[in-house]
Amino acid sequence: MGDAGAARAESPDLLETRRRNEILDTASQLFGSNGLRVSLEEIATACGIKPGSLYHHFDSKEAILVELVQRYHADLDRVADRVVVKARPESADAAEAQIVALAHAIAQCAAGHGAALHFTFYDPPAGASDELIRLAKREPTAIRAAMLSALQAGETASLVRPGLDLPIVSDRFCQTMLHVGLNLFHSSPPDKVATIQSGILLHGIAVKSPRSADLDKSNAFLAVKEVVKTWPRSDVVDRSDRASWLRSVARTEFGRRGYEVTTVRDIAAAAGLGTGSVYRVIGSKEELLTSIMREFSERAIAGWSAVLGSDSTTIEKLDAACWLQINVMERFYDEFRIQLAWLRQVPPEIPSLGWSFPQLLKALRAELAAGVKAANLRLDRPSTGLAARCVIEMTWIPENIVREIGARGAQQHARDVFLRGIAKR
């Protein structure tokens, strides 16, 4: 039977399912490249159909979002269901293979659902349905449980060293692999990223396991502490200063909702002002974003400059970078979330937010290459952009972990999993 005959032989239900999946795949690509500002009309055009025809399959953009997030959670749950973890592996190598295989599966799943994954990092748009809110806030408990089982099996097989908080390590492992879908790594194959990241988490980036007492006294760590002291301690804003007040409100809204879907109307409502008043004070949403991020960028750059310019080993600098990121997370959480979204995709009308990411990558690549040359660092092809991006990702401790175990606990966690690795040496 030819292609035309096969198409005619498909039942109406199969045809509808296939067409819906085509629309969902197209919408996912558009959301991933242009954000949630993509309209139904743009989705219809990309699908080669009229907007009216799209409504035969989905009655709203939210309906598409709901199904995209449902597909993501369903696929991630299937990854957890498919994995067969042996509680007592034959050897440490077998235990490591279990962990790495699961890590790769999570990364592949995340890469295939980037738009839905990114959506779960923010609050749903204003007026979202209860179903969409519930889906966006759903935790990936099944995959965390599967990873925890694999790590516990690794401990039984004498791969994983004792004394680690394995539920926290499991959460970190899963989040690190899920971040592969956030496009920080751009076009790099998910398996390649997962190989580097799981290798670091298991065996550490440091050739020799560093002592925490020595790291606390490093020039890099002390330099970051001095930079953090210069940051303002209070977020209290004088509401009579409308420009400062609007920046404060917009910072929260951009961090909570995401820049792309936050409107001037949303900012005005949150600030208790009229939309016209907001425009008169800030000019445009883009100008407001730039002014918010400029201060954050200057402080972050000062921190990285202090780290990379210190008289310290590469390992000491990476440890200090983790402490910098932990403090950034605590003090500039909204800006941090906005920055992550910007690294995924810079809106074309905003040429720069002030953060010199290419320059940071260049400096870090040189530092990593020097660390490998000095036999302080274990990292394949350290001078590549991918290696630097993987290292930057490892310096970011997930926000929920920082909140759960505190700043110093998060620093110890970073030293345990990033610098030393969880495997016995």
Residue positions per predicted region:
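C-terminal peripheral helix-coil segments that are non-catalytic and often amphipathic
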Residues: 1-10, 108, 145, 149-157, ...
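Helix-turn-helix
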Residues: 22, 26, 30-67, 71, ...
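Conserved hydrophobic residue
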Residues: 36-37, 160, 377-378
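Hydrophobic alpha-helical connector segments
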Residues: 67, 81-116, 166, 306-331
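Short, basic, alpha-helical segments at the C-terminal edge of helix-turn-helix-like DNA-binding modules
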Residues: 70-77, 294-301
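Amphipathic alpha-helical segments used for helix-helix packing
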Residues: 107-134, 148, 329-351, 399-400
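Amphipathic alpha-helical packing segments from all-alpha helical-bundle domains
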Residues: 129-157, 166-170, 174, 178, ...
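C-terminal structured domain segments across diverse proteins
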Residues: 327-424
